[in-house]
Amino acid sequence: MFLEGRLETLDFITLISFLTYSNKTGILEISINHNEGLIFICNGEIYNVYYNRKWGKDALFEIMLYEYIDFCFIEGNYKGERRIWDSSEKIILELLKDYDERKAFELSPINI
């Protein structure tokens, strides 16, 4: 399976959900403003993430700060180091919570 395209933030969560709930194995290559990153998925579990000199969940949450993300998913065996031990479901829920909190903050009125 080979997927590529350009996503906005919430669609990024949808893509991650699709890949994990479909039990895919492979590498999701991302590009944000010419900065490259990698999300390693094995049997539907997010094993590791690298972006902007960060590894693990810190890198994944940094990716979420960007509105536009170019991606390419290449299916295949992944035998790398696992740095993320939370279930993909838990990670997706954390991403959604973080997204909702940021949107609520952006929309909240300023009190003077």
Residue ranges of model-derived segments:
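Acidic, Ser/Thr/Pro-enriched low-complexity segments and adjacent helix/loop capping patches
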Residues: M1-I112
